[in-house]
Curated annotation (Swiss-Prot):
PROSITE patterns: SAM_MT_TRM5_TYW2
Resulting phenotype, residue 225 to A: Lack of activity
Protein name, as recorded: tRNA wybutosine-synthesizing protein 2 homolog
Lineage, top ranks: Eukaryota, Metazoa, Chordata, Craniata, Vertebrata
Keywords: S-adenosyl-L-methionine, Transferase, tRNA processing
Described function: S-adenosyl-L-methionine-dependent transferase that acts as a component of the wybutosine biosynthesis pathway. Wybutosine is a hyper modified guanosine with a tricyclic base found at the 3'-position adjacent to the anticodon of eukaryotic phenylalanine tRNA.
Chain positions recorded as S-adenosyl-L-methionine binding sites: 218, 225, 265, 293-294
Gene Ontology molecular function: tRNA 4-demethylwyosine alpha-amino-alpha-carboxypropyltransferase activity; tRNA methyltransferase activity
Gene from which the chain derives: TRMT12
């Protein structure tokens, strides 16, 4: 048995359980040893006390070694004359407590044990700074930006991330920051452990490969991806103005049966992922990628549908969306928007002035489906779902009328716009909702 035991990095990186340091003594001294270690907050409750082949007992302790002063105390005061040595348990057995804990609890146990082993006092502040949730992409875990912010973590080195990864059963770690405000939607993600950020995620049978340090992936959009996948788009040409890595382009191609998609994207890293995702899903021959600013897109008079999947607002893309719609038959716009729904908010508070509201609602040359009582009907004349919030409805009506104006400006003749559906996607806060407006746009028949 060895007096000084230190867990090596090789053992941590092997993927096997980390060896645990234990104090070995005779069975009849076990209870006194346990009580002392518990009083000193050195007893490892995550692993079981083990019986050794020679009949002695090993009590697991926290940290990478146990200072000599505690060994002397155990030998001379706690249990005078007792044999007391350190050893390693190469395959420690989890205690019943550890086996029954959640991943977050297991993380707390592992990290607190490791931190105290480095001579840093564990505190409520550090515990509160641990993550409670995360995104898992295969063997990579993406942590939220609001964890591991305390200054104490910065001095603990890369072994901290090895401990976190081992506790949560992954090999790579990354930490999310705020999305870049430059319009490319590049996430400020830092790779904490591992040599690359490429991951693969499967949604509804569609494979998405991307670099988490360069591209976004929203699990919350799955309901909308499932919805558009269920649409019948056979023979249709689509324009996706904010394609990203293929969030909506791929469901339309793979499941909805779109004939062709023009995918616009200006983040070069997303374009690399998009091109790869089109290939691995077998639809590359039905999609053309347009790299660059979609406001400079040269396409026109081509689309049966346009996807405007940018939040908080896709308004900058509305003119080009009108431009690419087919002039003879029109088409459908799928417009994403974050809408505030604070009690008492009116349309003006949502960014629509009273003057604009009056101008939009009563232009002589525009036909919309707004009714005198303020309700809106779908394409079959049925009322929209009562679950639709008034703020969603007001925003949809204002968007409907504004786009009718844009269509006339772009095409030089009146168009009819009609709200088909308002789809909630997710909530970002108690009063901020991500919704999708399905808006039908058709040129008015010529008179005479």
């Amino acid at each position: 048995m060895r007096e000084n035991v230190v867990v090596s990095n090789m053992e941590r990186e092997s993927g096997k359980p980390v060896a645990v340091v234990a104090v070995v003594t005779e069975p009849w001294f076990t209870q006194r040893y346990r009580e002392y270690l518990q009083r000193q907050k050195l007893f490892d409750t995550q692993h079981r006390v083990e019986k050794m082949p020679d009949g002695s007992v090993a009590l697991p302790v926290l940290g990478e070694t146990l200072p000599e002063q505690h060994l002397q105390e155990l030998r001379n005061r706690v249990a005078p004359g007792s044999p007391c040595m350190l050893t390693q348990l190469p395959d420690p057995v989890p205690s019943k407590r550890a086996q029954g804990c959640s991943p977050a609890q297991k993380l707390c146990l592992e990290v607190s044990r490791w931190v105290e082993g480095r001579g840093v006092k564990w505190s409520a502040e550090l515990e509160a700074d641990l993550p409670r949730s995360w995104q898992r992409h295969g063997n990579l875990l993406l942590l939220s930006e609001d964890c591991f912010q305390a200054k104490q973590w910065k001095n603990l080195g890369p072994e901290l991330w090895e401990t976190v990864a081992l506790a949560l059963g992954v090999q790579r770690l990354a930490k999310r920051g705020r999305v870049s405000p430059d319009g490319t939607r590049t996430p400020a993600v830092t790779l904490l452990l591992g040599d690359h950020g490429w991951v693969e995620h499967v949604d509804n049978g569609i494979r998405y490969k991307f670099d988490v340090t360069q591209c976004m992936f929203s699990f919350g959009n799955i309901t909308e991806k499932l919805r558009v996948a269920s649409l019948s788009c056979a023979g249709e040409v689509l324009v996706d103005l904010y394609a990203g890595i293929g969030y909506f382009t791929l469901p339309f191609l793979v499941h909805a049966g779109a004939a062709f998609v023009h995918a616009c994207e200006w983040n070069p890293h997303a374009v690399v992922a998009l091109r790869n995702n089109l290939e691995i899903n077998g639809v590359a021959d039905r999609c053309q990628i347009h790299f660059g600013d979609n406001r400079k897109l040269k396409l026109s008079n081509i689309a049966d549908r346009v996807i405007l999947g940018l939040i908080p607002s896709s308004e900058e893309g509305w003119p080009i969306a009108c431009q690419v719609l087919r002039q003879d038959a029109g088409g459908i716009l799928h417009i994403h928007q974050n809408v505030e729904s604070f009690p008492g908010k009116n349309l003006q508070a949502l960014g629509v002035s009273k003057v604009e509201k009056e101008h939009w609602l009563y232009p002589q040359q525009i036909t919309t489906n707004q009714w005198k009582n303020g309700a809106t009907r779908d394409s079959r004349g049925k009322m929209l779902s009562p679950a639709t919030k008034p703020e969603w409805q007001r925003w949809a009506e204002s968007a409907e009328t504004r786009i009718a104006t844009l269509l006339q400006q772009v095409h030089g003749k009146p168009w009819k716009t009609q709200i088909l559906h308002i789809q909630p996607v997710k909530s970002y806060a108690p009063h901020v909702d991500h919704i999708v407006l399905d808006l039908e746009c058709c040129p008015c028949p010529s008179v005479g």
